Swiss-Prot record:
GO terms for biological process: translation. GO terms for molecular function: large ribosomal subunit rRNA binding. It comes from the Bacteria. SUPFAM superfamilies: Ribosomal protein L10-like. Forms part of the ribosomal stalk, playing a central role in the interaction of the ribosome with GTP-bound translation factors. Keywords: Ribonucleoprotein, Ribosomal protein, RNA-binding, rRNA-binding. Belongs to the universal ribosomal protein uL10 family. This is Large ribosomal subunit protein uL10. InterPro entries: Ribosomal_uL10 (IPR001790), Ribosomal_uL10-like_sf (IPR043141), Ribosomal_uL10_bac (IPR022973), Ribosomal_uL10_bac_type (IPR047865).
Protein backbone atom coordinates (compact mmCIF):
# COMPACT_ATOMS: atom_id res chain seq x y z
CA UNK A 1 0.00 0.00 0.00
CA UNK A 2 1.43 3.35 -1.04
CA UNK A 3 1.84 5.95 1.67
CA UNK A 4 1.25 9.60 0.99
CA UNK A 5 3.85 12.20 1.94
CA UNK A 6 2.06 13.23 5.14
CA UNK A 7 1.89 9.62 6.42
CA UNK A 8 5.58 9.13 5.63
CA UNK A 9 6.49 12.28 7.55
CA UNK A 10 4.42 11.10 10.53
CA UNK A 11 6.18 7.73 10.49
CA UNK A 12 9.60 9.37 10.24
CA UNK A 13 8.77 11.73 13.12
CA UNK A 14 7.47 8.92 15.34
CA UNK A 15 10.41 6.58 14.68
CA UNK A 16 12.94 9.44 15.00
CA UNK A 17 11.56 10.26 18.45
CA UNK A 18 11.86 6.61 19.47
CA UNK A 19 15.37 6.38 18.00
CA UNK A 20 16.64 9.43 19.86
CA UNK A 21 15.41 8.05 23.20
CA UNK A 22 16.75 4.53 22.59
CA UNK A 23 19.87 3.37 24.41
CA UNK A 24 20.63 0.73 21.76
CA UNK A 25 19.27 -0.34 18.37
CA UNK A 26 19.44 -3.75 16.67
CA UNK A 27 18.62 -4.51 13.01
CA UNK A 28 17.79 -7.98 11.65
CA UNK A 29 16.45 -9.54 8.45
CA UNK A 30 12.82 -10.44 8.32
CA UNK A 31 12.87 -12.77 5.30
CA UNK A 32 11.02 -16.04 5.77
CA UNK A 33 9.43 -15.16 9.12
CA UNK A 34 5.66 -15.58 9.48
CA UNK A 35 3.54 -12.62 10.56
CA UNK A 36 2.26 -14.41 13.67
CA UNK A 37 5.87 -15.04 14.75
CA UNK A 38 6.66 -11.33 14.33
CA UNK A 39 3.55 -10.49 16.37
CA UNK A 40 4.76 -12.76 19.20
CA UNK A 41 8.21 -11.15 19.02
CA UNK A 42 6.68 -7.67 19.21
CA UNK A 43 4.56 -8.60 22.24
CA UNK A 44 7.50 -10.13 24.06
CA UNK A 45 9.63 -7.08 23.22
CA UNK A 46 6.97 -4.63 24.36
CA UNK A 47 6.79 -6.41 27.73
CA UNK A 48 10.47 -5.62 28.44
CA UNK A 49 10.53 -2.07 27.07
CA UNK A 50 11.72 -2.67 23.52
CA UNK A 51 10.01 -0.97 20.56
CA UNK A 52 10.04 -3.15 17.44
CA UNK A 53 9.27 -1.69 14.00
CA UNK A 54 9.24 -2.94 10.45
CA UNK A 55 9.99 0.16 8.43
CA UNK A 56 10.96 0.80 4.82
CA UNK A 57 14.67 1.30 4.29
CA UNK A 58 14.22 4.70 2.64
CA UNK A 59 12.23 5.95 5.62
CA UNK A 60 14.71 4.44 8.08
CA UNK A 61 17.57 6.19 6.29
CA UNK A 62 15.77 9.50 6.80
CA UNK A 63 15.21 8.66 10.47
CA UNK A 64 18.90 7.97 11.15
CA UNK A 65 20.21 10.88 9.11
CA UNK A 66 22.45 13.14 11.23
CA UNK A 67 22.09 10.94 14.32
CA UNK A 68 24.48 8.55 16.10
CA UNK A 69 22.57 5.77 14.32
CA UNK A 70 23.83 6.86 10.88
CA UNK A 71 26.33 3.99 10.92
CA UNK A 72 23.38 1.63 10.26
CA UNK A 73 22.99 3.00 6.72
CA UNK A 74 25.14 0.27 5.12
CA UNK A 75 23.10 -2.62 6.51
CA UNK A 76 19.68 -1.26 5.55
CA UNK A 77 19.04 -3.56 2.61
CA UNK A 78 16.22 -6.04 2.12
CA UNK A 79 13.34 -6.50 4.51
CA UNK A 80 14.39 -5.45 8.02
CA UNK A 81 13.04 -5.36 11.53
CA UNK A 82 14.45 -2.79 13.94
CA UNK A 83 14.40 -3.02 17.75
CA UNK A 84 14.93 0.03 19.96
CA UNK A 85 15.89 -0.64 23.61
CA UNK A 86 14.37 2.03 25.79
CA UNK A 87 15.60 0.87 29.24
CA UNK A 88 18.55 -1.52 29.20
CA UNK A 89 21.05 -1.58 26.29
CA UNK A 90 21.04 -5.37 26.19
CA UNK A 91 17.27 -5.89 25.89
CA UNK A 92 16.88 -5.56 22.10
CA UNK A 93 19.97 -7.68 21.42
CA UNK A 94 18.91 -10.31 23.92
CA UNK A 95 15.40 -10.66 22.50
CA UNK A 96 16.72 -10.92 18.92
CA UNK A 97 19.41 -13.46 19.90
CA UNK A 98 16.74 -15.55 21.64
CA UNK A 99 14.47 -15.30 18.57
CA UNK A 100 17.37 -16.32 16.30
CA UNK A 101 17.77 -19.62 18.16
CA UNK A 102 14.28 -20.76 17.11
CA UNK A 103 14.17 -19.22 13.60
CA UNK A 104 17.00 -20.09 11.22
CA UNK A 105 15.98 -17.47 8.62
CA UNK A 106 16.13 -14.66 11.16
CA UNK A 107 19.60 -13.11 10.96
CA UNK A 108 20.87 -10.19 13.01
CA UNK A 109 22.68 -7.68 10.80
CA UNK A 110 24.15 -5.37 13.42
CA UNK A 111 23.50 -2.96 16.26
CA UNK A 112 24.39 0.47 17.58
CA UNK A 113 25.32 1.12 21.18
CA UNK A 114 26.69 4.46 22.39
CA UNK A 115 27.03 5.64 18.79
CA UNK A 116 29.25 2.71 17.77
CA UNK A 117 28.35 0.02 15.25
CA UNK A 118 28.42 -3.55 16.54
CA UNK A 119 28.58 -6.19 13.79
CA UNK A 120 26.40 -9.30 13.97
CA UNK A 121 29.43 -11.42 14.88
CA UNK A 122 29.83 -9.47 18.15
CA UNK A 123 26.16 -9.04 19.06
CA UNK A 124 26.60 -11.41 22.03
CA UNK A 125 28.80 -8.78 23.68
CA UNK A 126 25.77 -6.51 23.80
CA UNK A 127 23.25 -9.20 24.75
CA UNK A 128 25.46 -10.44 27.61
CA UNK A 129 25.83 -7.03 29.25
CA UNK A 130 24.61 -7.07 32.85
CA UNK A 131 21.66 -4.91 33.80
CA UNK A 132 22.06 -2.20 36.44
CA UNK A 133 21.33 -4.44 39.44
CA UNK A 134 23.59 -7.23 38.18
CA UNK A 135 26.45 -4.78 37.59
CA UNK A 136 26.17 -3.37 41.11
CA UNK A 137 26.03 -6.90 42.57
CA UNK A 138 29.16 -7.91 40.63
CA UNK A 139 31.00 -4.79 41.77
CA UNK A 140 30.11 -5.38 45.43
CA UNK A 141 31.12 -9.04 45.14
CA UNK A 142 34.49 -8.11 43.66
CA UNK A 143 35.06 -5.49 46.34
CA UNK A 144 34.15 -7.92 49.13
CA UNK A 145 36.26 -10.70 47.66
CA UNK A 146 39.30 -8.53 47.14
CA UNK A 147 39.15 -7.01 50.65
CA UNK A 148 38.70 -10.40 52.33
CA UNK A 149 41.41 -11.88 50.12
CA UNK A 150 43.78 -9.07 51.08
CA UNK A 151 43.03 -9.59 54.77
CA UNK A 152 43.67 -13.33 54.51
CA UNK A 153 46.90 -12.68 52.62
CA UNK A 154 48.11 -10.20 55.29
CA UNK A 155 47.21 -12.61 58.10
CA UNK A 156 49.07 -15.40 56.32
CA UNK A 157 52.19 -13.22 55.97
CA UNK A 158 52.00 -12.21 59.65
CA UNK A 159 51.64 -15.82 60.77
CA UNK A 160 54.65 -16.82 58.63
CA UNK A 161 56.72 -13.99 60.11
CA UNK A 162 55.96 -15.07 63.69
CA UNK A 163 57.02 -18.65 63.01
Amino acid sequence: MALNLQKKEEIICKIHETATRAVSVVVATLDGIAVNEVTKLRKEARDIGVCVHVIRNTLMRKVIENTPLACLREILTGQNIVAFSMNQPRDSARIFVKFTKNHEHFKIKGAVFEGKFIPASKINLLSDLPNHKEAIFRLITIMKTSSIGSLIHILHILSNQKQ
